Amino acid sequence: MKNQIYMEFYKKLKEIVEPICEKYSYELVDLEYRREPHGWVLRVYIDKVGGVTVEDCAYLSEKISKELDIKDPIPHSYILEVSSPGLDRPLKRKRDFERHMGEKVNITLLEEIEGKKKFEGKIFKVDESSVTLKIDDSFVTIPLEKIKKAMLIVEF
């Protein structure tokens, strides 16, 4: 029940924030709403072709803040933070995997495939329902709905 309420709240926030991002040519990567020691925080992670600057974050923060004040979906005070997802961003959607084709990722699954729950390899192929990793000289195809967490591996 609690999870259902959170998902409805998350959906409502996304319905407010995503059109604003799209209007100004940004991609809404993720939303995070949580209680921290200094109070409630709404984090909005954005991206765009060429990357996100501090000025982009400030600009979009102002636009989002105005709309949230009008729609008022959060019944108490909170801090709004708008930022880039960073190099270690989670991959959540098909287009996230497509954008990082050929790059190395760590994927943790909800349930085992081939006796394993964790895989590390390069993104080889992405289709509507799965991602295929190249691991050394072999390949493993993972259904997107079975992915618990997927993160880019940043190599320097």
Swiss-Prot record:
Signal peptide: none annotated. Its main location: cytoplasm. One of its GO terms (biological process) is translation. One of its GO terms (cellular component) is cytosol. The keyword Amino-acid biosynthesis does not apply. Keywords: Cytoplasm, Ribosome biogenesis. Required for maturation of 30S ribosomal subunits. Belongs to the RimP family. This is Ribosome maturation factor RimP. It comes from Dictyoglomus thermophilum (strain ATCC 35947 / DSM 3960 / H-6-12).
